[in-house]
Design a protein with these regions (language model features):
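Short, well-ordered secondary-structure micro-motifs
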Residues: 46, 102-103, 123-124, 155, ...
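A structural motif corresponding to the C-terminal end of an alpha-helix
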Residues: 73-88, 209
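A short, acidic, amphipathic alpha-helical segment used as a generic capping/interface helix at domain edges
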Residues: 203, 221-232
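A short acidic, glycine-rich active-site loop
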Residues: 55-71
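Charged docking surfaces used in two-component/phosphorelay signaling
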Residues: 92-99, 218-224
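Aromatic/hydrophobic pocket-lining residues that form π-stacking "cages" and hydrophobic walls in ligand
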Residues: 18, 22, 77, 101, ...
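Gly/Ser-rich helix-loop-strand patches that form or flank binding pockets
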Residues: 15, 19, 26-28, 90, ...
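Small/aliphatic-rich secondary-structure junction motif
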Residues: 1-57, 84-86, 137, 150-218, ...
Length: 273
């Protein structure tokens, strides 16, 4: 089901965490790893005549630095893949980062991204601009890795009955089987009747697994907060959830619960579509 994993790296420490996670996941799933590093146009071509009569600086040295950084990032990723005995291919590109990742992701089954980018320390937001753009635009499942995340422990499946959550359940079954980890199913149970129906549905989707399946419900608090809290409590290695809730409005933005979980979780989050 997951034969090719795509990961993008900018060489930063947050990206290095995602590199390790992607290489380890590819090894355990026996998947190929495709690495890309992108020299962004806004950096390589960001200085131009702005009408003030001030000539822009020479870009040759900056372009050479950015290209060298991109090549070194891919070399580091390749070394990690080889250490895990993973088949690895790489590509260095120049352009608009999120658009190029989305384009290359069409040939992959899963995209793995660092949550924070190279400039994380200079901003107040909690998701890097490139990762945010990819999550908004891609039609592929995306795994967002925060700093400190480890590929160990059970899976937490947040299930709300949406199409994305059903896809997430299928991915969770695949991952749990291949990783040999249990699944904890979280359902927001403020509406008891709906909660019962959702647990019944997810039991049918999960089927008869060779790993334990446990159920968690919550009647209090915001679902995104309870999902993260539950994942912490069970020491989950990954949270799996749909990109959109049942009240989906637009194709362009991921749902509010998924967005909040991605922003705040200390655990990797797989967003399914």
């Amino acid at each position: 089901m997951i034969a090719t994993i795509l990961t993008a790296t900018d060489g930063s420490e947050p990206a290095a965490v995602a590199e390790r996670y992607a290489a380890s996941l590819a090894a355990r799933l026996r998947a190929r790893l495709q690495g890309i590093s992108i020299v962004e146009d806004r950096l390589a071509k960001g200085f131009a005549d702005d009408g003030l009569g001030l000539a822009p600086p020479s870009m040759e040295a900056l372009a050479a630095y950015l290209k060298s950084r991109s090549d070194l990032a891919l070399r580091r990723l390749g070394e990690r893949a080889r250490a895990e005995s993973v088949e690895f291919h790489s590509e260095a590109l120049q352009g608009i980062a999120d658009d190029l990742v989305v384009e290359r992701a069409q040939q992959a089954d899963l995209v793995v991204l660092g949550r924070d980018g190279q400039h994380a320390r200079f901003r107040s937001g909690l998701v890097g601009s490139t990762a945010d753009g990819i999550l908004r635009k891609t039609a592929k499942a995306a795994l967002v890795v925060p700093q400190g995340a480890q590929l160990s422990g059970p899976l937490l499946l947040a299930f709300d009955g949406s199409p994305g959550a059903r896809t997430g359940a299928q991915i969770a079954v695949y991952l749990a089987t291949r990783l040999g980890e249990p699944i904890h199913v979280f359902v927001d149970s403020k509406d008891k009747g709906r909660a019962v129906a959702r647990f019944d549905e997810v039991r049918g989707l999960v089927g008869s697994l060779p790993v334990p399946v446990r159920e968690i419900s919550s009647t209090l608090g915001r679902p995104d907060v309870k999902i993260v809290d539950s994942a912490r409590e069970v020491r989950a290695g990954v949270i799996v959830m749909g990109a959109f809730g049942r009240n989906r409005i637009t194709d362009y933005f991921i749902g509010s619960n998924a967005s909040a979980v991605v922003r705040t979780s200390p655990i990797a989050v797989l967003v399914a579509r």
